[in-house]
Regions:
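Helix-start (N-cap) detector for alpha-helical repeat units in TPR-like alpha-solenoids
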Residues: 290, 327-328, 370-371, 410-411, ...
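Catalytic-center loop of serine/cysteine hydrolases
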Residues: 108-134, 162, 166-315
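Conserved structural position within tetratricopeptide repeats
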Residues: 320-321, 360-364, 400-404, 435-438, ...
Length: 615
């Protein structure tokens, strides 16, 4: 059998135009060009109209971007439809074709969602970076103290090395004319691969102090290096080897602080801002064991979780039992106790009064402390939340006294902001939350408090920017109040994310709350079945209060013991704003009496001598 003749390249080239002509004939036969041009004309008109409407109604940029992506996605769909149905007499779609189009749209929708989610995450990161990154060069008289490395053989002394770094930071923070980055801001760069210049840029400082601590038997070695971030050069370095005693520890810390100030003064020169001298405290306990207990307890308080707080209270109680004159141990114990009741700890029934007693003892030993005054203040507000005798006037007076003694006390700003927020003074609450972030830019609870205040004040876009910045850092708290906003904007994925933060352990409740916000068919019977899933005695108070609120069982809200009543000022539920339960909650928190004495917040007003309204 003979082989067929081979096709020469020249023959193939001659056939190609015939193939192209055949394809062009099919394209014309199916009127694909007409379909595509018609679609592009309609799409252009729609896009232009959407742009005009968006500008007049101040739509977010992402809405126009999403609409554009949808129109682009329609091009291949139109071409496909034209191929199969452009010829005359082929106007109906089969079930298979409808399914294919649905799959294409679904895939396109997923791609658009991923693009939009990535865009939103990037926006949140940019917002976070904008808050972290100063717009001008860092002042020469500025420094951040990074967490000192734990070089102990067992590697279990991080709390101790952190304590050494924090003591030095505290010494430097009281030096006049010197800007010192907060502990929270600086310590977030623990074990990071970011270079010193970049860390300094993010913190808005010119100089970085880093170091290490090694405990070995009865001796301690502390090394420290001062770095000029602008040149990435070491300005000063020193290693201290001493017997391990509290007097020596404080002596080393004081030497480092003094040397740092001297080096900065020399580096800044006569043209720079004047830098004062560090006020060097004396060792306030002679017992190394007691100091070790204090450092462990204090570290657990700063990294607070429910188990951490219980252990922190135990360690700090042991410290004050062994040295009743250790003022800072009493101070930290007071701070642990005052927040424990609202973190769900129940081992001791009267945490708040125990906190007041510890704060009083700390001030008897050292009247110059700031935090005990803040504890006294927030304790008064907490007593009101518990239905006991407390005073709003005393709460605010004590918190203000704390800030008089230490204007950089971020916790005092946070607690005073929360107190103003509970009372409905949203402008004052916003100012203190902003001051808290000025004092400690990495204090995420301050950022979330500010987001809630902005939300309740009707500044929704600003609130969402702050909320997303916190979420980008992994912060979770009071998310439930943002759920109705996501639902109203049609952001179902965002809604699920918000609800999951507080209800992931109860998937059935999560599903019910999601449906209550998205499904018009979600009715009274389903609400009734969902309510028992909330345990107001053991659930997170914010989650329990928010769950009742979303399910519209307003009468149950007052039964939740919580240190915050942000729910009172949330404006996303018109029924709640007019409810008797809301007014009753305001009265239970004894706000009207304070308002009549000190002035009503702008959104409320008196009605005669005994009544009020807060529409």
């Amino acid at each position: 059998m003979s082989e067929p003749p081979a096709i020469k390249p020249a023959d193939a080239a001659l056939r190609a135009p015939g193939l192209l002509r055949a394809v062009w004939v099919r394209i014309k036969e199916h009127r694909m060009v007409q379909w595509t041009l018609a679609y592009l004309a309609v799409a252009y008109t729609l896009l232009h109209g959407a742009e005009l409407l968006g500008n007049s109604l101040s739509w977010p940029h992402t809405a126009l971007r999403l609409f554009t992506l949808l129109l682009i996605l329609g091009v291949p769909v139109v071409i496909t439809l034209a191929w199969y149905h452009g010829a005359r007499g082929h106007g109906r779609l089969s079930a298979t074709e409808i399914m294919v189009i649905a799959i294409l749209l679904a895939v396109g929708g997923v791609l658009i969602w991923r693009d939009t989610a990535t865009h939103r995450a990037a926006e949140a990161e940019r917002a976070a970076a904008a808050e972290e990154s100063p717009g001008t060069a860092a002042p020469a008289a500025s420094i951040a103290v990074l967490p000192f490395a734990d070089l102990s053989q067992a590697g279990d002394q991080a709390y101790f090395s952190d304590g050494v770094a924090e003591e030095i930071l505290n010494d430097l923070s009281h030096v006049s004319g010197l800007k010192v980055a907060s502990r929270t801001s600086s310590f977030q760069f623990r074990n990071t691969d970011i270079g010193i210049p970049e860390i300094a840029r993010k913190l808005g400082v010119r100089h970085i102090l880093e170091g290490s601590v090694r405990k070995a038997g009865d001796t301690v070695r502390i090394s420290a290096q001062l770095i000029d971030a602008a040149s990435d050069q070491h300005l000063w370095a020193q290693t201290f080897d001493r017997p391990l005693t509290t007097a020596n520890l404080f002596g080393i810390q004081d030497e480092i602080a003094t040397d740092i100030v001297q080096q900065l003064t020399s580096a800044i020169g006569t043209a720079g801002a004047a830098v004062g001298r560090p006020a060097l405290p004396e060792a306030d306990t002679a017992s190394l064991d007691v100091y070790d207990l204090y450092l462990k307890g204090h570290a657990l308080f700063l990294a607070r979780t429910k188990p951490n707080l219980s252990e922190a209270a135990r360690l700090l109680r042991a410290a004050v039992d062994q040295d009743p004159k250790f003022a800072r141990a009493w101070e930290s114990l007071a701070a642990v106790l005052v927040i424990s009741r609202f973190w769900g700890l129940t081992e001791e029934q009267d945490y708040v009064r125990a906190a007041i007693q510890a704060a009083d003892q700390a001030l008897r030993l050292d009247p110059g402390l700031s935090l005990p005054y803040a504890v006294r203040g927030i304790a008064q507000a907490n007593l009101i939340a518990l239905g006991q005798e407390g005073s709003w006037q005393e709460a605010l007076a004590q918190l203000s006294e704390a800030l008089t003694r230490d204007p950089r006390n971020a916790s005092a700003y946070l607690w005073r902001s929360g107190t103003y927020f509970n009372l409905g003074y949203l402008d004052r609450a916003r100012q203190d939350a902003e001051r808290c972030l000025d004092a400690d830019a990495a204090y995420e609870l301050c950022r979330r408090t500010l987001a809630l205040v902005e939300l309740c004040a009707g500044r929704t876009d600003a609130a969402l920017r702050l909320y997303e910045a916190g979420m980008a850092r992994g912060y979770v708290n009071a998310d439930v109040y943002f759920a109705p906003v996501a639902a109203a904007r049609g952001d179902r994925l965002g809604l699920l994310g918000i609800l999951s933060q507080q209800y992931r352990a109860k998937p059935q409740l999560l599903q019910s709350l999601y449906r209550s916000l998205t499904d018009p068919a979600f009715g009274p019977q389903e609400r009734k079945e969902a309510l028992p899933l909330i345990d107001r005695q053991h659930d997170d108070p914010e989650a329990a209060m928010g769950g009742y609120w979303l399910l519209k069982d307003y009468d149950q809200i007052a039964g939740v013991v919580n240190d915050s009543v942000a729910v009172i000022w949330s404006r996303s539920d018109p029924e709640w704003l007019k409810s008797a339960a809301r007014k009753s909650l305001i009265e239970r928190w004894r706000m009207p009496a304070y308002w009549r004495a000190q002035g009503f917040p702008p959104q409320c007003k008196p009605l005669g001598r005994a009544d009020f309204t807060c529409p």
